[in-house]
Amino acid sequence: MIVQSKNLKSQNTKFCMVRFGNVINSSGSVIPLFRKQIAAGGPVTITHKKVTRFFMTIAEASSLVIQAGEFAEGGDVFILDMGEQVRIFDLAEKLIYLSGRNITADDNGEGIQIQEIGLRPGEKLYEELLISGKELKTPNNKIFKSNEDFPSDEVLVNAIDDLKEKIENNDIAGIKNILKNLIEGFSEV
């Protein structure tokens, strides 16, 4: 919203955004964590057996950023077609087998245990890359864009001022209410 608002005020610069999936082997990617857990003998921890995520390579992420700059008209959101979501449980299984290990149901076996630790607050079972708006084509058939709705500059400035006040007063309910009214799909945690 802030980037989209900034774009409206700019005459010389086009502002746009990219929405990433999980970048394989980046610092925050689950794959290095799983490899470390497997090397330590397990368990491999997942939040939920049904969680799915999109994945992209570092090269795809870099290309998305560069091409988004080329395709930008201003205020756009660019998203890479990353194919189907991957079930994290299946990824954990494959990495265990690729390491030459087996999976065990408990920590007394010879294999690696996959342990569900529960969803974190606000974590979803699946990712939604397109929040609102339509999926629009770009010159690259693997990259699409979405022109998502956003509040007027006046509404945004007022909301930010209200947020600052609620934060200073530690008004959690007030903060959540502002975010709920401002952000489509906002989920209270």
Residue ranges and their predicted role:
Residues V3-V189:
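Strand-loop microenvironment adjacent to phosphate/nucleotide-handling motifs in alpha/beta enzyme folds
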